[in-house]
């Protein structure tokens, strides 16, 4: 199993979990520049992996918006290069897409894969373009449209700003959080994603919604998660932001019925938070 992006938020956890279960080759940018096709081909030719979990990416959506050429080189061309090299050695590819492909859709309710994505951001457009390019190279490759993910704030592995980190920081520092009331999205425990990747090896090729469902607004989600964490009076320091997304609510909430039909399921967002906080309950 070759894992790209092995020093990042997701890739580090994938490498940690599957080491010992597979012969893991954990690759970071220092070992392979995915924007350079020949660099990718050399490394794949050396290791000839049976399975590739492609996590390397520019995942900061704001950075991608400010640096569109770099985002395209890494997120689109980089994934295309990995797909080509993987196909050349006969490996099974699982690569990461995003719920951001839906960030321009105006439909309400959880969105299934049958809805045509209409991304309006650089990151979302790049992810959708990546899906098309990979599908043309290797129809058996599996793309996973991930939600925003979190881990416990005390994790020794790399942490990004996420639901639990943001809540703890605001509560401990006594600062205010403004959270959108007109945004709907799933938020998923990264460990739930990691432990379900192995089952994806059996999936037919294509793009799948992959993460926790959630029918609450982002504001409601933050309030309820704060209560689960035992952070007092969340309505006093988590403030509703009704000004974001004025034209229509931003709906990234995904319907995961398709992945569920293959025996892969996730708890909804709040149940996932509860399990993360109280794992033995």
Language-model features and meaning:
Residues 73, 77-81, 101-144, 149-150, ...:
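Catalytic helix-loop patch of NAD(P)-dependent Rossmann-fold dehydrogenases
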Residues 194-245, 250, 277:
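Mid/C-terminal beta-alpha module of Rossmann-like enzyme folds, strongest
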Residues 4, 27, 52-56, 93-99, ...:
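SDR active-site strand-loop-helix element
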Residues 135-185, 192:
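NAD(P)-dependent short-chain dehydrogenase/reductase
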Residues 1-19:
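N-terminal Rossmann NAD(P)H-binding glycine-rich loop of SDR-like oxidoreductase domains
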Residues 232, 247-281:
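C-terminal amphipathic/interface module of NAD(P)-dependent oxidoreductases
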Residues 19-42:
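Adenosine-cofactor binding site in Rossmann-like domains, unifying the SAM/SAH pocket
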